[in-house]
Amino acid sequence: GLRVEQGPTGHRHFDFAAPEVALLRQALQSTREAYRTPPTELDPMVGNVWYRQVGLREVGIRGEDALHWVEGLHEARLGREKLAEGWMKTLPPLGQAGRWHLDAEEVESFVATLNDHRLRRAAEFDLGEGDLEVRAMEKSKGDKRVALVEIHFLAWLIELVLQEQVK
């Protein structure tokens, strides 16, 4: 199964099974597309979790200030989109298990990208805490179930990436 090891310089080595590669590729690909989408054209639920439009209004940030804030966040996401393009090139091919290497300086962006995918999928299905329990996943069907599987898998992957290495 999935293993993540931390190297001496902070880089990570992953050992993936074929289905894990497929899931990660799918998550990165769809997140890259969403990153390239102008914030105003995103599903409003997604726009709100990624760009906090509602939150900005609540704290009185409006008009041009709000636009600059959202633009800044979008720029950061476009930067991650470029990184994700590189990750997809170096991941094992679809349908294959294999090892993968992530540089130390990209760990934070990788985790942020996976988290964005989780937030987006939860927003698309308007999932709350209760929906994220494993029992709820077992009962759900179709696209919602796929979203829940992705959310849980990526949470686990993030945990493995961030865990303190036991010496």
Residue ranges: model-predicted function:
Residues 100-127:
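Hydrophobic/aromatic-rich, well-ordered segments within soluble, folded domains that form packed cores
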Residues 33-42, 118-131:
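Extended intrinsically disordered, low-complexity coil regions enriched in Ser, Thr, Gly, Ala
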Residues 83-102, 132-141:
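Short, charged/polar, low-complexity loop and linker segments
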Residues 1-32, 36:
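Short, extreme N-terminal leader segments that mark the start of a protein/domain
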Residues 143-167:
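Helix-rich interaction surfaces within compact, conserved domain-sized segments
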Residues 32, 88, 118-122, 158, ...:
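A structural signal for well-ordered alpha-helices, especially hydrophobic packing surfaces
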Residues 34-62, 68-78, 82, 86, ...:
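Basic, glycine/lysine-rich polyanion-binding surfaces/domains
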Residues 8-11, 15-18, 63-75, 98-108, ...:
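Short, solvent-exposed segments of well-ordered alpha helices
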